[in-house]
Amino acid sequence: MKSTIFFALFLVCAFTISYLPSATAQFVLDTDDDPLQNGGTYYMLPVMRGKSGGIEGNSTGKEICPLTVVQSPNKHNKGIGLVFKSPLHALFIAERYPLSIKFDSFAVIPLCGVMPTKWAIVEREGLQAVTLAARDTVDGWFNIERVSREYNDYYKLVFCPQEAEDNKCEDIGIQIDNDGIRRLVLSKNKPLVVEFQKFRSSTA
């Protein structure tokens, strides 16, 4: 019994030490220059708006329910609020912290029942796409990295497979499918550059 407890404590300590921020680690900042709160809700908006907006769910291919994570085609649409949560016991989120990401909420959709909200990576049509699927997912975690030190609040999302080296992590970028839907996918060196804005409920 004692050996089981000691082993569990060892795993927790090893995981925590592996992801302690370095002395130069910086907090991820929102558009108000405030650090992102661990477990807080934010809009993730593209720095270059063009004709596209925030992040939301949509159905692609043969999906009936909106299980694919996409970028809105409407530049005025901020998308759905995202909850960023690190398992580390920290009040704020710093660069390269391991993160889970989920949508804050979904509208009730007939025939779909209770929608999953947590992001995952799934192999699909030769791509590794960001989805809300609960099966056949790639084990790993997301993190946030600055794109340029010149712009302290411009960032990219990165996905790291479990037990992979840093050089195996990949950026989250955009792939436009045949229907013009802008899907979030793993993309080598072509990240979607974003900023984070505090989420404010329309009912607040």
From Swiss-Prot:
One of its GO terms (molecular function) is serine-type endopeptidase inhibitor activity. Gene3D superfamilies: 2.80.10.50. Disulfide bonds join C65-C112, C160-C169. The keyword Disulfide bond applies. Pfam families: Kunitz_legume. InterPro entries: Kunitz_inhibitor_STI-like_sf, Prot_inh_Kunz-lg. It comes from the Eukaryota. Has probably no trypsin inhibitor activity. KTi2 is responsible for most of the Kunitz trypsin inhibitor activity and protein found in soybean seeds. Belongs to the protease inhibitor I3 (leguminous Kunitz-type inhibitor) family. This is Kunitz-type trypsin inhibitor KTI2. It comes from Glycine max. The gene is KTI2.
